C-alpha cells in the first residue's frame, strides 16, 4: 500500500467550503482512480487554517498515475479555499488497520 500526504493552508473562514469541496468535487474524482482505496482529511482545531489529506493507494504506480493525470484538477478545485500550493509527500505504508476495519464492516 502507498500513501500520498497533502498539507495545505486554508484561507480564513473557509473550513465549511473546504469540506464541501472535498465531498462534492474531490472524492468523486478520487473514487474513479485506479488503485484508490481511501481518503482521510484533517483540519486543525481552532482557526482551522491548516489541513492535511492522506490518500491511500494499492500501489505506488497508482498514486503516481493520479498525480501526473488528475491531481491538477484537484489543485484547481482547492484554489478557492487554499492559500498557495499544497505540499505533497509520498510514503510507503508499513502498517494499517484499514483492511481489517473494512472486513469487519462488510461482515
Describe every region a protein language model picked out.
Residues 2, 9-11, 38-49, 76-107:
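Glycine-rich beta-strand-turn "strand-cap" elements at beta-sheet edges
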Residues 18, 22, 42-43:
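Hydrophobic alpha-helical segments with strong N-terminal bias
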Residues 24-37, 47, 56-90:
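An amphipathic, aromatic/His-enriched active-site/gating alpha helix that lines ligand/cofactor pockets
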Amino acid at each position: 500500500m502507498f500513501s500520498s500526504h497533502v498539507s495545505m493552508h486554508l484561507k480564513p473562514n473557509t473550513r465549511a467550503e473546504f469540506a464541501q469541496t472535498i465531498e462534492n468535487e474531490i472524492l468523486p474524482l478520487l473514487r474513479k482512480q485506479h488503485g484508490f482505496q481511501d481518503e482521510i482529511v484533517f483540519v486543525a482545531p481552532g482557526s482551522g487554517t491548516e489541513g492535511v489529506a492522506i490518500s491511500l493507494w494499492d500501489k505506488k504506480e497508482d498514486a503516481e498515475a493520479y498525480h501526473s493525470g488528475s491531481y491538477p484538477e484537484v489543485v484547481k478545485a482547492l484554489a478557492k479555499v487554499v492559500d498557495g500550493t499544497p505540499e505533497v509527500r509520498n510514503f510507503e505504508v508499513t502498517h494499517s488497520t484499514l483492511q481489517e476495519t473494512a472486513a469487519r464492516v462488510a461482515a
